Amino acid sequence: MSLSTIICIGMAGSGKTTFMQRLNSHLRAEKTPPYVINLDPAVLRVPYGANIDIRDSIKYKKVMENYQLGPNGAIVTSLNLFSTKIDQVIRLVEQKKDKFQNCIIDTPGQIECFVWSASGAIITESFASSFPTVIAYIVDTPRNSSPTTFMSNMLYACSILYKTKLPMIVVFNKTDVCKADFAKEWMTDFESFQAAIKEDQDLNGDNGLGSGYMSSLVNSMSLMLEEFYSQLDVVGVSSFTGDGFDEFMQCVDKKVDEYDQYYKQEREKALNLKKKKEEMRKQKSLNGLMKDLGLNEKSSAAASDNDSIDAISDLEEDANDGLVDRDEDEGVEREYTFPGEERTKGEVNENSAPDLQRRYQEAMQQVGKTASSETAENIAKYIRN
């Protein structure tokens, strides 16, 4: 069985790090210890042993001092620095894939620093292109007892799913404090969610959501997210007691199968399309360069000239084809003979035939004029092209 990657994402205070600790303990109890990676550079202490820890190579406070950044800017910069070595991280994980079945990754609590940053996309894409990857979106169940907060969390989960395009499991954490049954019901029953909105209005009066713009907006969003809910696996867990982690791992196995069946093919299509577009862009740039240099026009003009003429000497040879053959070549018996200079002054013989020399000279002048004219025209055409 190939190694699968679980990327844990959640808002600050959702219990993400505690979830990682309990998941690590659960898998070790099952005799399948995971390969653990910590990507939170600002955490002071992690309650689990990490095989790769971003804090070993990047000092968060030094980044703040050297680059004069605030907390969130330092987290983004730390992730940027770490992402430059992501190929080495992938290589290390690949070397251990025969010893581990799962790789679990903890991310910063400032969720936007990871999800919406370029470094977060690089890290996610690198793992997703090498291993079956699943997103575990951790939700604080007690905080989501309000319909407004619940809807906001679901919209955030939807945006993460759209951004990563990876299988997602919505994990309702802290079920030891508040059961997640109400959330599962809201996701599957629209009327139940409407009743919760009305109840919120009754409890909070004018501050509730039972009427007006907010009520209409929340109802519309719940209808819109109905298709989104159908693609999710939802599980309730308690990081404090350990309840629900068996169900969570079953969901992971299911999502890994979905990754191999659907997401992997879609990702390959997307990569091939991207590669094809890049090749087309390079070819277009090359054609533009050739056009700017004028190489295409010159080559096409030379090709057309080669089809019609090869050289100017060929024109002259073709023009000479119109010359009149000598009488000897034609086998005609000469009608007169003049010795010396008299060859050009003789009289016509007894048959009173036309002066053959005059006819010969006229023919030569006419043929020479025609050949020269054709040669001049062809030369002019060659120069113009």
From Swiss-Prot:
GO biological process, one term: nucleocytoplasmic transport
Recorded superkingdom: Eukaryota
Outcome following mutation: residue 112 to K: Impairs heterodimer formation with GPN2 and GPN3
GO cellular component: cytoplasm; cytosol
EC number: 3.6.5.-
Site (Stabilizes the phosphate intermediate): 72
Note: Present with 15200 molecules/cell in log phase SD medium.
Record protein name field: GPN-loop GTPase 1
